[in-house]
Design a protein with these regions (language model features):
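Active-site-adjacent helix/loop segment of glycosyltransferases
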Residues: 183, 220, 224-305
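Short, well-formed alpha-helical segments that are part of the catalytic scaffolds
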Residues: 10-24, 350-355
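A conserved acidic beta->alpha catalytic loop
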Residues: 20, 37-46, 62
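Glycine-rich, basic loop-to-helix element that forms the pyrophosphate-binding segment
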Residues: 59-82, 88, 104
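A short, conserved alpha-helix in the catalytic core of glycosyltransferases
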Residues: 178-180, 185-204, 208-236
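Short beta-strand-to-loop acidic/aromatic patch adjacent to the donor-nucleotide binding site
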Residues: 84-96
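Acidic/His-rich active-site region of diverse nucleotide-sugar glycosyltransferases
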Residues: 69, 95-203
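Non-catalytic, C-terminal membrane-associated alpha-helical segments of glycosyltransferases
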Residues: 270-347, 430-462
Length: 462
């Protein structure tokens, strides 16, 4: 069997993965490990060579994304003698695997000759007791992935360390109600995907998506050959939660590649409706002040219509900074009034103590706190409350009256309040790890772009 891992500048993650692989129950002498490095510059290759002398490494000369990386590995595998490998196990570089993860996937394929692909149940690395997905189905009307058991939790696992979970009993069919040991699905993520080598070669390489939806398309294409796709409730991996990842340049690939997927496997109406939904997202990002991310949606549509695939050179003007450096904003003498909404969990984002310190150091700094009608409790003392009415219309009028009264409005990347983006000179978008300072949206800019928006709306899918 061949294990294919693709990595790019995630040295510590891929080392953790390889360490977890050293503890799996599947016989090590039956495994070859191939790591595809996408031109990392963080010392990944050097660390791999120093710690693991029984793996093979192929270095790409540039970052080819997950698509190009796996295609490099698959091309190498397809060139081997047909009898050399019966199975190929594709793994993300930022997962750790349960000791029985591979054995249980092999058991599924060995017992079911008509199943060509078996995938693991994906748990969340940051919340190890929570399921991220147990396979998924693909809605070919819009490209949405319908995840099984999404965010379902195993309460008895709370408080357990990940190292203990990797060797504990991991049969979810025994701890979750109405959960089968395995089930047929339409898609399993290449975070942990076992496929029969002959079927992989028959299916071919991944479409040139660079990242995202490439494994979805590959699963759909494999199923077209008459083979089943299954997920195992006994094979577990832990992966960094997508919920913890803030939307950025990846939005381009998500929105472009889903159009290629629908164009190939659905109909023109689905493509048309998805283009229009993408245009709605473009308008939303314009309205909240993330204009650079808004443009990615239009670029995604344009490149799809022009047949452009692969990697795109994306340069975003606004950069994310570590949350610990937010103090430089709060201590800027030019910043005198800041408004904070209830949607920001100041303890979770670790900025509470930074605000407390800034308010002590700068008595002239006024911090306003927007209090929702359903929860009047404030997270910080010494803030000036702004009580919001219950009526939605009244709340919008309140925001309208507050416009131009603040230097900075804080916004949560996870739960953005649209009218809040319009009441300050700048918006500081924050999440658990980073923040990004952006200018407030401009109505004149949005109005100038409306004709182009309307034109694209009516040309969608033609």
């Amino acid at each position: 069997m061949l294990i294919i891992i693709v990595t790019w500048n995630k040295k510590d993650y891929v080392l953790d993965l390889l360490n977890s692989l050293s503890s799996i129950t599947f016989p090590r002498d039956q495994l070859d490990i191939l790591v595809i490095d996408n031109a990392s510059n963080d010392g990944t290759v050097e660390a791999l060579k120093a710690q693991f002398d029984d793996i093979q490494i192929i270095r790409n000369t540039e970052n080819l994304g997950g698509t190009g990386g796996f295609n490099t590995g698959l091309t190498w595998a397809y060139d081997q003698a047909e009898s050399r490998y019966d199975y190929l196990w594709l793994l993300d570089n930022d997962v750790v695997v349960h000791q029985n993860a591979l054995s249980e996937l092999v058991a599924v394929l060995d017992a079911n000759p008509d199943i060509a692909v078996a995938g693991s149940t994906m748990m969340q690395l940051d919340y190890p007791w929570r399921i991220n997905e147990m396979g998924a189905f693909v809605d070919l009307q819009n490209g949405n992935l319908l995840f099984n058991r999404h965010y379902e939790e195993i309460p008895s696992w709370r408080g357990k360390q990940i190292d203990d979970l990797l060797v504990d009993n991991a049969d979810l069919s025994q701890v979750l109600m109405h959960c089968q040991p395995q089930m047929d699905v339409e898609y399993v993520a290449a975070a942990s995907l076992l496929i029969r080598a002959p079927v992989a070669k028959q299916t071919g390489l991944w479409m040139d998506f660079f990242i995202h939806f490439d494994d979805v398309e590959w699963c759909l294409r494999t199923a077209k050959t008459g083979h089943r796709i299954a997920v195992s409730a006994k094979s577990l991996i832990w992966h960094l939660s997508a919920a913890a990842k803030v939307p950025n340049w990846i939005l381009y690939y998500d929105n472009r590649n889903v159009l290629y997927l629908l164009d190939k496997y659905s109909d023109k109406l689905a493509v048309k409706n998805t283009i229009r939904r993408t245009l709605k997202k473009y308008l939303y990002y314009q309205l909240i002040g993330k204009t650079d991310l808004a443009e990615l949606h239009v670029q995604a549509i344009t490149d799809f219509e022009q047949g452009t695939m692969g990697k795109k050179n994306i340069q975003l003007p606004y950069k994310f900074e570590k949350i610990a450096t937010i103090s430089r904003i709060l201590n800027d003498p030019a910043i005198k009034k800041i408004v904070v909404p209830w949607t920001i969990n100041m303890q979770a984002s670790n900025i509470e103590h930074i605000f407390v310190s800034a308010m002590k150091n700068r008595p002239e700094l006024e911090v306003f706190y927007i209090v929702p009608p359903h929860n009047p409790q404030r997270q910080l003392t010494n803030t000036i409350p702004i009580l919001m009415p219950r009526s939605v219309l009244s709340r919008y009028l309140k925001y309208f009256r507050l416009r131009n009264k603040f230097d900075i409005a804080l916004q949560s990347d996870y739960q953005t309040i649209l009218p809040l983006s319009w009441i300050a000179r700048e918006n500081l978008f924050t999440n658990d790890e980073y923040f990004c300072l952006r200018p407030a949206p401009q109505l004149s800019r949005i109005i100038r772009q409306l004709p182009s928006f309307v034109k694209k709306w009516y040309q969608a899918g033609k």
